[in-house]
Amino acid sequence: MAPRLPARCWRQLSLVERSATHTTTTAAASSLLLAGRTTPTFSASSPSTVFPSLLPQITKRGVKYGWSTLPKRSRPTRFNQVTQGLPAPTSGPAAALKRREKTTPLRTGVLAVKKGMTVFMGRTGARIPCTVLQLDRVQVVANKTRAKNGYWAVQVGLGERRAENVGAPQLGYYEAKGIPPKQTLAEFKVRNQDGLLPVGVQLFPDWFHVGQVVDVRGITRGMGFAGGMKRHGFAGQEASHGNSLNHRTIGSVGGSQGSGSRVLPGKKMPGRMGAQQHTVQNLPILMVDNELGIVVVKGAVAGHKGAVVKVQDAVKKAPPPEEFVEATKQLLNERFPDAEEKLQAARKLHLELKEARRQGLIDSLIKNGLTEKADGNAAVEASA
């Protein structure tokens, strides 16, 4: 409800009430005031006859503040706090996605196994050091959407695991998707919903092309506890001239007065070295082979032999050509035309098996011909 104004405020008003019951218009009232023939009077007991001519005729129901002319604010959602009549917020999930829009790849990446390093001979005879990465049964396991998860991402799995080594909840997770249990799972954020892929499709090395630059992320080899010379490249102390048992020490760690008689945060000191995530950016792709399932990149990659690394389009370079992106999507649709149908069938079978397990009928179903495969997928096999 609109707030009440005291009577002293009404006396200072110089407007003439305009309503259907009065025949005096504003123009006529103004002429009378100029001629000095009349003086407008207002009744302190009827303020409602003044306000219709001063404020717009809008409803105040649902408006929190008295004389606001803004419409009712929309209720903020979990991932979007933008309201009507207000500028876009500079903080929150929506603003964070907007800031990272230009640095988020358009496509998902893949998981690969580092097989080792070798030499690639260029056309001019130059010996180029390179790393061989193998894609071992890389499949799309799930998609994350903006409405449900707050961002767009693709979950990718590498390799396979025996069902005996996987927990029951994870077995049900894979069973509902019709995918065997994966050795490693990883998530790759994409810019929008165009980067999502059908669940169950397999990504081959031709997901990339020769000459493309990629970013490779991996876990560096653990070096254990290392000193300052190995960990940070310190020069060490004097080799002679009175130095005793301090040849590889780091020396002073700070002053006694200017720094407050303390060791400043971030001081480089001996400690555990390695076993941290490291990204090598802008590595050119030298070779792609679908038969061998390998991608050869120039240079070194973090991790030991057999380590799992993430390979994705470079964020600091131009994305792949639009024609190539569309061609790869079309190729996936041709290779897996019934991916959606298989997913729905797997979900239906998962619900049936889940209900059978809940009722304790899974043993009888197995005797009647239903078997659960070792890879975690459930299937109905016709008994001989």
Curated annotation (Swiss-Prot):
Gene3D superfamilies: 3.30.160.810, Translation factors. It comes from the Eukaryota. One of its GO terms (molecular function) is structural constituent of ribosome. InterPro entries: Ribosomal_uL3 (IPR000597), Ribosomal_uL3_bac/org-type (IPR019927), Transl_B-barrel_sf (IPR009000). It is found in: Mitochondrion. Keywords: Mitochondrion, Ribonucleoprotein, Ribosomal protein. The keyword Ribonucleoprotein applies. GO terms for cellular component: mitochondrial large ribosomal subunit. Residues 240-249 have a biased composition (Polar residues). GO terms for biological process: translation. Residues 80-101, 237-262 are annotated as: Disordered. Disulfide bonds: none annotated. Its main location: mitochondrion. Component of the mitochondrial ribosome (mitoribosome), a dedicated translation machinery responsible for the synthesis of mitochondrial genome-encoded proteins, including at least some of the essential transmembrane subunits of the mitochondrial respiratory chain. The mitoribosomes are attached to the mitochondrial inner membrane and translation products are cotranslationally integrated into the membrane. Belongs to the universal ribosomal protein uL3 family. Component of the mitochondrial large ribosomal subunit (mt-LSU). Mature N.crassa 74S mitochondrial ribosomes consist of a small (37S) and a large (54S) subunit. The 37S small subunit contains a 16S ribosomal RNA (16S mt-rRNA) and 32 different proteins. The 54S large subunit contains a 23S rRNA (23S mt-rRNA) and 42 different proteins. This is Large ribosomal subunit protein uL3m. The gene is mrpl9.
